[in-house]
From Swiss-Prot:
Gene label: fadJ
UniProt subunit comment: Heterotetramer of two alpha chains (FadJ) and two beta chains (FadI).
Enoyl-CoA hydratase, as annotated region: 1-188
EC number: 4.2.1.17, 5.1.2.3, 1.1.1.35
Annotated site, Important for catalytic activity, chain positions: E116, E138
Main localization, broad class: cytoplasm
Pfam family, one: 3HCDH
Record's protein name: Fatty acid oxidation complex subunit alpha
Organism: Shewanella loihica (strain ATCC BAA-1088 / PV-4)
Length: 706
């Protein structure tokens, strides 16, 4: 069997230890590497001629991308996972204990266990490549750094900075890492190895104190100050997680124990907490999302069909969505885009939108002004169909008006080539209806983005019955180039995400009309795990947008989608939400705290009564979403529970720690869910009637993920 580690002794007394996992594009750490590494370290220790060690990767753009997450699934118990952590501790302690200098030479991803390996070295040097990123992102999988990261990072960069890194999972670029003191030098890739060798030859340096500001020194230098840091971190974590994610609190505890009781105790606590987290429901759910998205990246969306190249794009409409789509096409996909709008003002807005996003990148030093200008040069504008004959894809982002979209289809087919794909960003109109105006319906597809485009990761790729596999595969590949996570869904009103969201929002509106207060409703759903509450979401999306979609869904899907009377009353008072400064909340106020616009209750003709139990309020909204998600699976709107889970998490912020609607239903049990729906059906009517698939599953005891 090929080895993952090789040792090369140089004439100057430096040994270069190269990690290159056979058959993999990136290095990941695995439990079975432990004996191999220990064997290498013993060999180094026994050779008096070795004056220093450089650890480097044999992969092109990856130092070590982290631990192999799949090995955690083999842990049957928390104790199994603790043993993995302890094994890592032993290996890294053996490395750290070498009496000769050990230097990590880092190029590319240095994440998770990879950074913990680097932290166990005596010095670190990294390249200035854009692909070099350093971080401990374990919290995003519901875990904590289990290889000593919670102990070595605070000692190197300070308590506050290390907590910020570990609690957010943020990844640092080379210059940020240097400024923080995480690495000792940043050099071009061409001299990385030579620099690391010179550092090792220079001999061990005395341990450096963390680079701390005056305030950080005052706080971290005393027990009282350190206590303030930990208590403040706990307070912020609880506010953000609502108690739904156990990992952040355990990270804080590991650091606290290590700082107050020493590294031996800290490592013991780290292993203990790591084991508990590995077998927690939250981490299992978050890891399932990781594996699902990794799997989806390998799929074309159309079987074995390969996508065609997209070298030029046109966007119809310079509004908020059009500007956002054009922006991610140039900045992420690096594809030239031409924006068409009937108004010069619309075109100016689209350019300004893109420039504003790029300017943020310059301000944060993620790019130079020259790179910004080159990316802006990829975007051109027009009020006519000019310069688009060779466009490979046209993305339509105009109003939800079927006649207007029909005109767009005809115009594009007249002005563009026969190969050009027409992708509509409609949020509710069936693609089949849009394609009725097309001479080449096989080129027509839905490409539903979510707002704001540059932030929301999901896109729905909607194929009607005549869309060709080639069009699907090309559109999926294009969306991935834009940095999106695409799910392919079948055509139908509301598609998947808006369809399950509509019933959730309608139920929240019903609760409002029953006398629940706006902020109490929002807090109940945020406590459940959503990033924002339904009333806030309505204000952000636009109350008018919700009101337009509801009749379409009701017409196509039936009475259960009938919108509550609240929408008409709000629009009659010109309340559209944040966009016009009038909605459920106050806008333009100087107060940092978001305040309810109390006049909304008068508009709706109600007086808020006693606040209901938050869990009960959340349940009533969420079971509607769950029931409809199963209907979508039943009807083939989504291809699998996996796609349904990813769509809900990335499209509307369904609580990730629950794993998505389908994993959550498995944890509840179909029998329990059907009983809950029937109870609400008795109280509120047939909009809560459980769908056939759920009833069958309740009777058979089956699950979505067997």
């Amino acid at each position: 069997m090929d080895k993952s580690f090789t040792l090369n002794r140089l004439d100057n007394g430096i040994a270069v230890l190269t990690m290159d996992v056979p058959g993999e594009t990136m290095n990941t750490l695995r439990a079975e590497f432990g004996p191999e590494i220990c064997e290498m370290l013993a060999e180094i220790k026994a050779d008096a001629g070795i004056r220093g060690v450089v650890i480097i990767s044999g992969k092109k753009d990856s130092f070590v991308a982290g631990a192999d997450i799949s090995m955690l699934d083999a842990c049957a118990t928390a104790e199994d996972a603790r043993e993995l952590s302890k094994q890592g501790h032993e290996v890294f302690f053996a490395l750290e204990s070498l009496s000769i200098p050990v230097v990590a030479a880092i190029n590319g991803a240095c994440l998770g266990g990879g950074l913990e390996l680097a932290l166990a070295c005596h010095q670190r040097v990294c390249t200035d490549s854009n692909k070099t990123m350093l971080g401990l992102p374990e919290v995003q999988l519901g875990l904590l750094p289990g290889g000593g990261g919670t102990q070595r990072l605070p000692r190197l960069v300070g308590i506050a900075k290390s907590l910020d890194m570990m609690l957010t999972g943020k990844q640092l670029r080379a210059k940020q890492a240097l400024k923080m003191g995480l690495v000792d030098d940043v050099v071009p890739e061409s001299i990385l190895l030579q620099t690391a060798i010179e550092m090792a030859l220079a001999g061990a340096r005395p341990a450096k104190k963390p680079k701390l500001s005056t305030v950080e020194k005052l706080l971290e230098g005393t027990p009282v100050g350190r206590n303030i840091i930990f208590e403040q971190a706990l307070k912020q974590v609880n506010k953000k997680t609502q108690g739904n994610y156990p990992a952040p609190e355990k990270i804080i505890d590991c650091v606290r124990q290590g700082v107050t009781k020493g590294i031996v105790k800290g490592l013991e606590v780290e292993a203990q907490h790591f084991g508990d987290l590995v077998v927690s429901n939250e981490s299992e759910a978050l890891r399932s999302i990781f594996f699902a998205t990794t799997e989806m990246k390998k799929e074309s969306g159309a079987g074995d069909v390969s996508p065609k190249a997209v070298n030029k794009v046109m966007v119809l409409g310079g509004g908020l969505m059009g500007g956002g789509i054009a922006s991610v096409t140039t900045t992420k996909a690096k594809i030239p885009v031409r924006v068409k709008d009937i108004s010069e003002i619309g075109l100016s807005n689209a350019l300004a939108y893109a420039y504003k996003l790029l300017a943020k990148g310059v301000k944060r030093r993620h790019m130079t002004p020259a790179v910004r200008d080159n990316l802006m040069a990829l975007m051109t504008t027009t009020t006519e169909y000019k310069g688009i004959k060779d466009a490979d894809m046209v993305v339509e982002a105009v109003f939800e008006d079927l006649n207007l979209k029909h005109q767009m289809v005809k115009d594009v087919e007249r002005e563009c080539g026969e190969h050009t794909i027409f992708a509509s960003n409609t949020s509710s109109l069936p693609i089949k209806q849009i394609a009725e105006a097309a001479e080449r319906p096989e080129n027509v597809i839905g490409l539903h983005y979510f707002s704001p485009v540059e932030k929301m990761p999901l896109v729905e790729v909607i194929a009607h019955d005549k869309t060709s596999p080639q069009t699907i595969a090309t559109t999926v590949a294009f969306a991935r180039k834009q940095g999106k996570t695409p799910i392919v869904v079948k055509d139908g009103a509301g598609f998947y995400v808006n369809r399950i969201l509509a019933l959730y929002m309608n139920e929240a509106a019903n609760l409002l009309l029953e006398g629940q207060s706006v902020d109490h409703l929002d807090k109940a759903l945020v406590k459940f795990g959503f990033p924002v509450g339904p009333m806030t979401l309505l204000d952000e999306v636009g109350i008018d947008v919700g009101a337009k979609i509801s009749p379409i869904l009701e017409k196509e899907l039936g009475e259960r989608f009938k919108a509550p009377a609240a929408f008409d009353k709000l629009l009659a008072d010109d309340r559209k939400g944040r966009k016009n400064g009038k909605g459920f909340y106050q806008y333009g106020a100087k107060s940092k705290k978001k305040l309810v616009d109390e006049s909304v209750y008068g508009v709706l003709g109600l007086t808020p009564g006693a606040d209901g139990e938050p869990i009960a309020l959340a349940e009533r909204c969420v079971v509607q979403m769950l029931n409809e998600a199963v209907r979508c699976l039943e009807e083939g709107i989504i291809a699998s529970p996996r796609d349904g889970d990813i769509g809900a998490i990335f499209g509307i912020g369904f609580p990730p720690f629950l794993g998505g609607p389908f994993r959550y239903m498995d944890s509840l049990g179909a029998k329990h869910l059907v009983e809950t729906l029937k109870r609400y059906q008795d109280q509120f009517g047939d909009r809560f009637a459980p769908c056939d698939r759920l009833v069958e599953m309740a009777e058979s005891g089956s699950k979505f993920y067997e």
